[in-house]
């Protein structure tokens, strides 16, 4: 795949990519997107700045455009990364694609997040701690999530988020698609992938510096 126009995706998503000036895929996007569009799980090794965000966002948006009853959940280690991801999603959904999203991170107003959740956002992006806060409050429902992204998973485990991630996974239906990305693949990541991913396709790329 040399151009996003070659993808078998909804026309409004193609238009949105063009408006946002996303034309040529990075190596991780060229590898991951066609696999994710087939509904397969992915175990991906990629550094920050290789273009992972679009690699998981394009298949997610395509799925949500086709199926109006589903949600996507993106879990990442830091507020900064979560904010960058939501910015990309907002850029792609601001015109024709009317799919609401919510950013669940610490240090931000809980009331504002509750208001956004009440608007039935279908894309949830957040850090493990704040997502768990909302699960405890019963303000977040994950029962119709069928697309899960774990981004920079090695960092999340290094930061001690394993129990929170495992708790989040209890709230998601057993049958769902998972894309797990990590800069490295130590044994604890492989254990998580064996436990939670279904016959994942393994992909790996080096470093670049794009969203």
Predicted regions and their residues:
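Conserved pre-motif I regulatory segment
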Residues: 1-45, 151
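Short, conserved catalytic or interaction motifs in soluble domains
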Residues: 9, 56, 66, 87, ...
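Short hydrophobic/aromatic beta-strand immediately N-terminal to the Walker A/P-loop
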Residues: 43-45, 73, 179
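The conserved Walker
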Residues: 46-50
